[in-house]
Amino acid sequence: MNYVGLIIVLSCLWLGSNASDPDDPLLVQLPQGKLRGRDNGSYYSYESIPYAEPPIGDLRFEAPEPYKQKWSDIFEATKTPVACLQWDQFTPGANKLVGEEDCLTVSIYKPKNSKRSSFPVVAHIHGGAFMFGAAWQNGHENVMREGKFILVKISYRLGPLGFASTGDRDLPGNYGLKDQRLALKWIKQNIASFGGEPENILLIGHSAGGASVHLQMLREDFGQLAKAAFSFSGNALDPWVVQKGARGRAFELGRNVGCESSEDSASLKKCLKSKPASELVTAVRKFLIFSYVPFAPFSPVLEPSDAPDAFLTQDPREVIKSGKFGQVPWAVSYVTEDGGYNAALLLKERKSGIAIDDLNDRWLELAPYFLFYRDTKTKKDMDDYSRKIKEDYLGNQKFDIESYSELQRLFTDILFKNSTQESLDLHRKYGKSPAYAYVYDNPAEKGIAQVLANRTDYDFGTVHGDDYFLIFENFVREVEMRPDEEIISRNFINMLADFASSDNGVLKYGECAFKNNVGSEKFQLLAIYIDGCQNRQHVEFP
């Protein structure tokens, strides 16, 4: 056992003997002092607990430091977690600035269940393209009603504050990923005090949260922090995750906020630290060339090997091929029309017509930004590729509402499905622990596509989040679950509870047991639909 593992084990043992007060379960003893949660009827909550020093001042653009302060009074863990400062796609109006820079907290939700003295733990990383989103946006009422596990929501730095990088040791980037990792360490060390089982931690996330889960898992010591991982509609190989071109964008950020005289990374970092955080985040709008496109102008990067506290120094593909990653059970998923999240905004009505009309004149300009190959090809190669994929999916059709479904399929394939297949293929060849996958096809009455398109008269199919928002309530649904969705919701929640506590990595959904892909010649894919589930084998994803 290495030093980090020993410290975690000793911390868990010590904290296990200092759990919540049996006379008052709202009071919990931590190394920092006592905190008080809230009784919500069917569950307890302990919100906005700091796990890191505030990433402000000199700590901006630095790896997070563990929270060191001691509480002389009882810490009131009753405040809804604040969103990390962001330029939020879903905030209406011109000013989309939301949140605060001091935001590195975890929030814990514990069911009341007299039959259990302890619970498995599901740690949750929210999505939002590494640019926006918040822990509070993913509701927990469905999960708490089932009463199967403790839920921990992680907040982490976003946008330029979390992911600006010059690609060298002065401003290496990936601060948001480093936040997540520190939060996981905090959970491992402290969750026993809340009645959680530190040996039964499952890490999950959706979209950028799912990609974050996969990236965390690519750390070789991940198994010391969690026993399993689940990536919903997002993984490390998606083209919008680990991007190139970050150095140019970091200096462009500097020019946008008055740091144009900075000629090297060190001086740029110093200047950016001196600027108001709101100014840095508001500058995100300068990187958007069409609505909220590209949806992830700042994202994870490859860091140089000499960077302090480096998180990711190799392409994820090479990490998986090396076998030197967290060899724990992993599941990944996609829905049949994930790309609706990216394409639906093109059906929004404007005074000059629907937005998709613009693509007829601007496809060669916009496609590299929609599909994230703007920094990987020459101008000629980008144009050739843009023409080819249009021909492959739309043929001679023009861009309009009649051809929209083909465009949405293009977005689904390139941004989600193809990379899900590639990641699963690598894990089945180089992984040692089980690797599972499912595809979901059961459209919601209202979801993220209807919100972005601002219309309900189009059948978008099963879009990004239609499965995940049955586990965690989200503002984009705005409708009650149908009876079939209530069954699916319970199946998903039970699936997570069982995965977190399983000793052999077995994964089940309802009556269907997932099949392991490791060592399999064909892809083992569980299809989940309105009235059941079925195991299917594929040479390529359907």
Curated annotation (Swiss-Prot):
Effect of L302M: In strain: Lig72
Keyword Transmembrane helix listed: no
Effect after changing E391Q: In strain: Lig74
Effect caused by changing L394I: In strain: Lig74
Reactions catalysed, as given in the entry: a carboxylic ester + H2O = an alcohol + a carboxylate + H(+)
SUPFAM superfamilies: alpha/beta-Hydrolases (SSF53474)
Localisation: Secreted
Cysteines engaged in disulfide bonds, as pairs: C84-C103, C259-C271, C512-C533
GO cellular component, one term: extracellular region
A matching Pfam family: COesterase
Domain of life of the organism encoding this protein: Eukaryota
Main location: secreted
Annotated active site: S207 (acyl-ester intermediate), H464 (charge relay system)
Glycosylation sites recorded in the entry for this protein: N40, N418, N454
Key words of the record: Disulfide bond, Glycoprotein, Hydrolase, Secreted, Serine esterase, Signal
Assembly and interaction partners: Monomer.
Function: Transferred from the ejaculatory bulbs of males to the female genitals upon copulation, plays an important role in the reproductive biology.
Family: Belongs to the type-B carboxylesterase/lipase family.
Name of protein: Esterase 6
Source organism of the structure: Drosophila mauritiana
Organismal lineage: Eukaryota, Metazoa, Ecdysozoa, Arthropoda, Hexapoda
Gene that produces this protein: Est-6
